[in-house]
Curated annotation (Swiss-Prot):
Species of provenance: Mus musculus (Mouse)
Recorded consequence of changing R920A: Abolishes AMPH and BIN1 binding. Reduces EPS15, SNAP91 and auxilin binding
Tissue expression profile of the protein: Expressed in the brain (at protein level).
Entry's Gene Ontology molecular function annotations: clathrin adaptor activity; disordered domain specific binding; kinase binding; lipid binding; protein domain specific binding; protein kinase binding
Assembly behavior: Adaptor protein complex 2 (AP-2) is a heterotetramer composed of two large adaptins (alpha-type subunit AP2A1 or AP2A2 and beta-type subunit AP2B1), a medium adaptin (mu-type subunit AP2M1) and a small adaptin (sigma-type subunit AP2S1). Binds EPN1, EPS15, AMPH, SNAP91 and BIN1. Interacts with clathrin. Interacts with HIP1. Interacts with DGKD. Interacts with DENND1A, DENND1B and DENND1C. Interacts with FCHO1 and DAB2. Interacts with ATAT1; this interaction is required for efficient alpha-tubulin acetylation by ATAT1. Interacts with KIAA1107.
SMART domains noted in UniProt: Alpha_adaptinC2 (SM00809)
Protein name as annotated: AP-2 complex subunit alpha-2
Swiss-Prot/TrEMBL keywords: Cell membrane, Coated pit, Endocytosis, Lipid-binding, Membrane, Protein transport, Transport
Length: 938
């Protein structure tokens, strides 16, 4: 590069930049910029011709103004004129301006291309370098059309200087990546391969990158590069060789070239025996050097050394043909598992995941199981813990399955929310794949539902039902186990589904025990009925009609339930239809017909586990899971089949996601088209600029919203296409909500746009901030969005989340209420009995108290009531109320503008099945809203 003369300092540019930096306000900056733009315009339009220095200075000022964020609509022609200058600095500024400001549709593109062609033909290495840099920086299709045929000629020309060859190789690589169809293969390809023997480090490094990319699409054209790459790698890593010794980086010879050569060799299978022997020597040398004491304590030395080592291990794993090398690589990675560097531990775990899939190294990987389990328990970085989970999954077999599953279940209780669903899938797969004793499998899945029920997908509980139905030896144990599990005060809904299905099929196997008589089984299931969603209630109704067949002694009790107004006049059409049909069936059908219609489910056909298919979709192609399944086929006795998809009685209805015992219909899908737009309400669009019509609230949205008043995590909405999950945390007046959008199909969602909608008054009381999500959601994938929440003042309404996307060419439009309620900003406050009643008396003004007497909607269980009050956000004060049956709580609602003390008292009346709820706060609107929210929970 030519030296820059003193006159090229451009003092005027320095003064202008200094003036901009000294501006005290944005207005002052804009004023100074406008003044300068006017000056530059006058200079460009003046009668006096500008010299090259002045043009360069003014073009630099325009470029600086553009980088400040201001539009530039003139000066382009002056920049193009600079391209024809013979002074390096002027030409450099011209190319810089062109690279940054000129787009491919510009009218000046022909002039620019002519200037670039002139520089490429000039044989001046400096000018050629500038032109190549410009082509690569712009990288447009138009550039590829104009120069893709010229650059290979420059690259392989014998008289081209090394610096230009390097630039040409990288420029061609850039054009090939953007427009591969415009880069023709030809005679130059064989000559490019021989650049691997070039003595200039920059040339051979750039050529290696180019050849690696080209070889992935054109392997036959570049297969001769294998022997040259092995030869060059051997000369670099062998101590006796002097090849590229001048390019030693912290005692490691040409590390980045070595990495690129090793990566190139992964494009081809193991070479012929002679070349393979030489490559094996290289890899052994790299592994041997990794065992040597470090020649320097500086981090640059270890980084370079480990970069070569990990790429060598990747090549060993990729070829998967040398048992000795695979075992040595595993042992080397095992040493890194306890290294103090977090990045090294992460990379070691990642590489060992792939090693575990090789039949040669699987046993060697298993020897490190205790270290990996320890990493799962002690690592601070969640990404390292994630890799530890992946490695445990990959190294699992029959010999260690129970230990690994137990450790995963233990970790699941504290795992990061973003990876819980994946861990659940892996535990379910391992428990099924390596189950010798299927009682252990049943225990594991039920424990899985207990620990992480919100993350147990339908595929998991479908699968346990399939396996229980297919295996006679476990049916009685499964019925007994789910019966015992359902006796817990609070059961997850997925456990109710599994319990309802299994007891409906095999409850007769435990009915002989007085502790699990038919009536007790029915009462136990029915006690959960009112706490469940519509699909689960539909399943339980099917279980009840199964009980009519299995246990005639409870027929009258079940008919009374089916005959009740809550069933026959249910607002949900599906539940109403089932109740009517089942009641009629139990009344008119003979015993033989009833037994035929309600006979036990037949075994499911043997197919691939739907859980494994879901995990493959979630992880994407070419993952450890795929490698394990394709490269390490072990003999596994797995029973199972497809998930039990219920049939619908109506051709127009969509199958319910719940397992349907009789296939008598399904829950209608969510609306799939945009309704007429409605006026009123301010759209605070924090996700997108879309202004499409917003759908009305999805069916069940209010029920799901109410379920989140006393909890922060779970599934907010689910239909056949989309699942929306939430995880939220709140502290004082601030909160953060993680929204997970899951694509349940195998087809991409396009134009995926979530929008947050707030009413006028809500916008002033609640501040919500977030960022857009990716508009494309792959099939089986999940995207996450974070919403930051600030409570400015108390509020009554909740935001609405509207999701619009295209699925299979059909427009989908879903709206749900986002469970951001006033009680989320509750901070519990512990108080003694005396303090509580003293404060209670202070809040005795009529406008400060709100009281509600209401009928119990759910079973009046003491433990559940306590859990709901605590989940509501209040502190539960023990031994404060003189009546031990009453519940009292205290807390403070935090907003940005004020703090509001809150006291509550809940008085249950078991005989009348009623409650009296009293709220006293220092603000009447807060008392009213909290009373409304909490009353809906009991």
């Amino acid at each position: 590069m030519p030296a820059v003369s003193k006159g090229d300092g451009m003092r005027g540019l320095a003064v202008f930049i200094s003036d901009i930096r000294n501006c005290k306000s944005k207005e002052a900056e804009i004023k100074r910029i406008n003044k300068e733009l006017a000056n530059i315009r006058s200079k460009f339009k003046g009668d006096k011709a500008l010299d090259g220095y002045s043009k360069k200075k003014y073009v630099c000022k325009l470029l600086f103004i553009f980088l400040l964020g201001h539009d530039i609509d003139f000066g382009h022609m002056e920049a193009v004129n600079l391209l024809s200058s013979n002074r390096y600095t002027e030409k450099q500024i011209g190319y810089l301006f062109i690279s940054v400001l000129v787009n491919s549709n510009s009218e000046l593109i022909r002039l620019i291309n002519n200037a670039i062609k002139n520089d490429l033909a000039s044989r001046n290495p400096t000018f050629m370098g500038l032109a190549l840099h410009c082509i690569a920086n712009v990288g447009s299709r138009e550039m590829a059309e104009a120069f893709a045929g010229e650059i290979p000629k420059i690259l392989v020309a014998g008289d081209t200087m090394d610096s230009v060859k390097q630039s040409a190789a990288l420029c061609l690589l850039r054009l090939y990546r953007t427009s591969p169809d415009l880069v023709p293969m030809g005679d130059w390809t064989s000559r490019v391969v021989h650049l691997l023997n070039d003595q200039h480090l920059g040339v051979v490094t750039a050529a290696t990158s180019l050849i690696t990319t080209l070889a992935q699409k054109n392997p036959e054209e570049f297969k001769t590069s294998v022997s040259l790459a092995v030869s060059r790698l051997s000369r670099i890593v062998t101590s006796a060789s002097t090849d590229l010794q001048d390019y030693t980086y912290y005692f490691v010879p040409a590390p980045w070239l070595s990495v690129k050569l090793l990566r190139l060799l992964q494009c081809y299978p193991p070479p012929d025996p002679a070349v393979r022997g030489r490559l094996t020597e290289c890899l052994e040398t790299i592994l041997n050097k990794a065992q040597e004491p470090p020649k320097s304590k500086k981090v640059q030395h270890s980084n370079a050394k480990n970069a070569v080592l990990f790429e060598a291990i990747s090549l060993i794993i990729h070829h998967d043909s040398e048992p000795n090398l695979l075992v040595r690589a595993c042992n080397q990675l095992g040493q890194f598992l306890q290294h103090r560097e977090t990045n090294l531990r992460y990379l070691a775990l990642e590489s060992m995941c792939t090693l575990a899939s090789s039949e040669f190294s699987h046993e060697a990987v298993k020897t490190h199981i205790e270290t990996v389990i320890n990493a799962l328990k002690t690592e601070r970085d969640v990404s390292v813990r994630q890799r530890a989970v992946d490695l445990l999954y990959a190294m699992c077999d029959r010999s260690n399955a129970q230990q690994i599953v137990a450790e995963m279940l233990s970790y699941l209780e504290t795992a990061d929310y973003s990876i819980r669903e994946e861990i659940v899938l892996k535990v379910a797969i391992l428990a099924e794949k390596y189950a010798v004793d299927y009682t252990w499998y049943v225990d594991t899945i039920l424990n899985l539902i207990r620990i992480a029920g919100d993350y147990v997908s339908e595929e998991v509980w479908y699968r346990v039902i399939q396996i229980v139905i297919n295996r006679d030896d476990v049916q009685g144990y499964a019925a007994k186990t789910v019966f015992e599990a359902l006796q817990a005060p609070a059961c997850h809904e997925n456990l109710v589904k599994v319990g309802g299905y299994i007891l409906g099929e095999f409850g007769n196997l435990i009915a002989g025990d007085p502790r699990s008589s038919p009536l007790i089984q029915f009462n136990l299931l029915h006690s959960k009925f009112h706490l469940c969603s519509v699909p689960t209630r539909a399943l339980l109704l099917s279980t009840y009609i199964k009980f009519v067949n299995l246990f005639p002694e409870v027929k009258a009790t079940i008919q009374d339930v089916l005959r009740s107004d809550s069933q026959l006049k249910n607002a949900d059409v599906e539940l109403q239809q089932r109740a009517v049909e089942y009641l009629r069936l139990s009344t008119v059908a003979s015993t033989d017909i009833l037994a035929t219609v309600l006979e036990e489910m037949p075994p499911f056909p043997e197919r691939e586990s739907s859980i494994l298919a879901k995990l493959k979709k979630k992880k994407g192609p070419s993952t450890v899971t795929d490698l394990e399944e394709t490269k390490r086929e072990r003999s596994i006795d797995v029973n199972g089949g497809p998930e039990p998809v219920p049939a619908s009685t109506s051709a127009a209805s969509t199958p319910s996601p719940s397992a349907d015992l009789l296939g008598l219909g399904a829950v209608p899908p969510a609306p799939t088209g945009p309704p007429p737009s409605s006026g009123g309400g301010l759209l605070v669009d924090v996700f997108s600029d879309s202004a499409s019509a917003v759908a009305p609230l999805a069916p069940g949205s209010e029920d799901n919203f109410a379920r989140f008043v006393c909890k922060n995590n779970g599934v907010l909405f689910e239909n056949q296409l989309l699942q929306i999950g939430l995880k939220s945390e709140f502290r004082q007046n601030l909160g953060r909500m993680f929204i997970f959008y899951g694509n349940k199909t195998s087809t991409q969602f396009l134009n995926f746009t979530p929008t947050l909608i707030c009413a006028d008054d809500l916008q002033t009381n609640l501040n919500l901030q977030t960022k857009p999500v990716d508009p494309t959601v792959d099939g089986g994938a999940q995207v996450q969005q974070v919403v930051n929440i600030e409570c400015i003042s108390d509020f009554t309404e909740a935001p609405v989340l509207n999701i619009q996307f295209r699925y299979g060419g059909t427009f989908q439009n879903v709206s749900v209420k986002l469970p951001i309620t006033l009680n989320k900003f509750f901070q519990p406050t512990e108080m003694a009995s005396q303090d509580f009643f003293q404060r209670w008396k202070q809040l005795s003004n009529p406008q400060q108290e709100v009281q509600n007497i209401f009928k119990a909607k759910h079973p009046m269980d003491t433990e559940i009531t306590k859990a709901k009050i605590i989940g509501f956000g209040s502190a539960l004060l023990e031994e404060v109320d003189p009546n031990p049956a009453n519940f009292v709580g205290a807390g403070i609602i935090h907003t940005k503008t004020t703090q509001i003390g809150c006291l509550l008292r809940l008085e249950p009346n078991l005989q009348a099945q009623m409650y009296r709820l009293t709220l006293r706060t220092s603000k009447d609107t807060v008392s009213q809203r909290l009373c409304e929210l909490l009353s809906e929970q009991f």
